[in-house]
Amino acid sequence: MRHRQSGRQLNRNSSHRQAMFRNMASSLVKHGVIKTTVAKAKELRRVLEPLITLAKTDSVANRRLAFARTQDKEVVGILFNELGARYQERPGGYTRILKCGFRTGDKAPMAYIELVDRPVVEDAPEVVEESAEA
């Protein structure tokens, strides 16, 4: 019986699941948005949101806890220097899941998971070269 067992197994063993969510959390922190299945996105939210809450209070102990969970110094730096300050006034709900159809091949429901209030990068203006008329 599976009484009081929370979280999805996702057809993986525990070490594979832990490594997968560590990599996905690092990618989401670095890029701001990633595309994955809906089930993985919902589980990733459970992994990442406590890390961002931890990053709101910058201390050596919190940085070590974050590093123990991510194993990436660059991600810890982004968490504490950028995301902690960005979400200082927000009491939770740092991620948004947007469904985006189904994957070709196995029709798995796909979704984008993104950080809310992320800065919008404007596209560079396209340079149109004028052809020389002779």
UniProtKB/Swiss-Prot annotation:
Pfam families xrefs: Ribosomal_L17
Alphabetic keyword roster: Ribonucleoprotein, Ribosomal protein
PROSITE patterns documented for this protein: RIBOSOMAL_L17
InterPro entries referenced in this protein's UniProt entry, alphabetically: Ribosomal_bL17 (IPR000456), Ribosomal_bL17_CS (IPR047859), Ribosomal_bL17_sf (IPR036373)
A Gene Ontology term for the protein's cellular component: cytosolic large ribosomal subunit
Gene Ontology MF annotations: structural constituent of ribosome
Single Gene Ontology BP annotation: translation
Family to which the UniProt record says this protein belongs: Belongs to the bacterial ribosomal protein bL17 family.
Subunit structure: Part of the 50S ribosomal subunit. Contacts protein L32.
NCBIfam families per UniProt: L17 (TIGR00059)
Protein name: Large ribosomal subunit protein bL17
Species whose genome carries this gene: Colwellia psychrerythraea (strain 34H / ATCC BAA-681) (Vibrio psychroerythus)
